[in-house]
Amino acid sequence: MDEFHRYGKEDNSRQQCFLYPLFFQEDLYAISHDHYLDGSSSSEPMEHLSSNDQFSFLTVKRLIGQIRQQNHSIVLFVNCAPNPLADCKKSSYSESVLEGLTLVLEVPFSIRSKYSVEGMNEWKSFRSIHSIFPFLEDKFPHSNYISDARIPYSIHPEILVRTFRRLIRDAPSLHPLRSVLYEYRNSPENLQRSIIVVPRVNTRFFLFLWNYYVYECESILFSLLKRSSHSRSLAHRPFPHGTHFHRKIKHIIIFSRRNSLKSIWLLKDPKINYVRYGERSIIAIKGTHLLVKKCRYYLLLFRQCYFHLWSEPYRVCSHQLSKNCSSSLGYFLRVRMNPLFVRTKMLDELFIADLITNEFDPIVPIVPILGLLAREKFCDVSGRPISKLSWTNLTDDDILNRFDQIWRNLFHYYSGSFGRDGLYRIKYILSLSCAKTLACKHKSTIRVVRKELGPELLSKIVFKRTRFDSLPFSSKAAARSQRERIWHSDIPQINPLVNSWQKIQDLKIENLFDQ
C-alpha cells in the first residue's frame, strides 16, 4: 500500500486507472482481516469470534469475482442478517471484503484530500468540539446573521457512485461499490430505498462514505463562494484601530472613487464564515437580510442540483443575532453589546470615550437541562431531587462515580460560558439525588448516610475532580473565573444530555415548518 501511495504521487492518472487489480492482492485482505480481528471496523465483540475459523484468501477472491455480477452479489452476505452492513452478526468474509473495498477507495481520496488541504492555509483539523468556539468567538461579533444548516444524509446509491466516478477513472473498481450499495438499498429493513450516510456509524465503510460525501459538498461549496466573493485578497487583511472602523471605511470609499470602482466592492463585499462539526454546519454572515435569504436559497439549490437531493427547508434556519438566539452545539448562541469606558489623558485634559463592542455570548440552557434531568428521574418536574431507583442495585463506588461523571461532563462542556451560576443548581440536584440514592439503597435517611460515610462525602468523592479543575481557589480567582472562558481540547463529542436537548430543538423546528 505504501508503494502504491508513492506510485500515485508520481503519476496520479495511472493511479486512477489501475485500482481494480488491487482487489486481488492478498496483502490487501491480510490488512483488512487484521483490522477486522482488531475490532477497528466492526462492532462485533471479540468474544464472538471463533478461533477455529479458517480464513481463506481464495474464497475472498471468488467472492470478489462474483460481486461484479449484480445477480450474484448476494453471495457476499452469506450467513448475514437482512441488514448486512449494519447488523453486528457479520461473517468474516463480508467484513473483510468491505474492509478491502474501503482500503482501495481510500487511496485516491487520501492523496487528493492531502493536496487540497495543503493549499488551504485556513484549514485546521481538530478533534475537540470546543475548538469551534474560539472561531465563533472571533467571527460572531462581526456578523449580524447566523444560519444553522444540517447536511442531508439520505442519498441515492447511484449519486454516490457518480461522485466517485469523477475521482476514479477505473470503472471496474466501482462495480463492487455499486453492488454493495444496491444490496444495502434493497435490504428488507431499509424502507427508504436510499443510503443513510451518517457520521455516527462504527463501520469504517460508512464512515468513509460520509467523509467523502461531506468533502465533495464542502469543496465545491467553497469554490463557489470564492468565485462569487470579491474580497478574496481582503479576507485575512487586518484593519488597524478597529474602533473607528466605519469612519475609516467611509473615508477609503470616497478616496477610491477617484481611482477605480473595484476597490469599492472590495470594501463593501459581505463576509461569510463557515464552520462544521459532524452533520451540522454554522454559517455566520455579515450583510443584509436579502443576502441571507439568497445564501439560504442558493445552498438549498446547490444540494438539489448537484446531488439531486430534495433538502427540506427546515434544514437551513437563519436568525438575526441581535434579536434571536440560535440553539446549536448545546448552547444558546447570541451576540450582546458590551459597553467599555476608556479614559485618555493628554496634558492636563481628561477625555472619556464610551465604546460599545459586540461580544460572543454562549448561554447555558439551564431549563432544558433540568427537563432532561427530570426525564432521566434525577428530579421531578419542579426540580426537586429524587433518588435514582434504577441504580440502587449498584455498589456505592459505582453510584458515586456515575454521578461524578455526569457532573464532570456537564461542567467541562459548559466551561466556556460566562454565566455558570445555573450549573450550581444542577450540581445541587445531582448531589442531593446521589445522597437520596445511597439512602434508599441502605434503607436509611440522608442524615444517617452522611453520619456513617462522613459529612464531606459528596464534596470529596462525587465532585473531587471538578473543583474548577486546578484553578486557584481564592476569592479573586473565583470571581475572575466567572469572567473567563475555558475551552477544553479533550471533548470529542457533544454531551449525551445536551445531544438529546438538541434533537428536541430540531423536532420543534420541523414542526414549525410543517405547520
From Swiss-Prot:
Described purpose of this protein according to its UniProt entry: Usually encoded in the trnK tRNA gene intron. Probably assists in splicing its own and other chloroplast group II introns.
MF GO annotations: RNA binding
Protein's name in the database: Maturase K
Family, as annotated: Belongs to the intron maturase 2 family. MatK subfamily.
Keyword Chloroplast assigned: yes
Keywords of the record: Chloroplast, mRNA processing, Plastid, RNA-binding, tRNA processing
Native species: Pinus cembra
Signal sequence segment: none
One GO cellular component term: chloroplast
Gene: matK
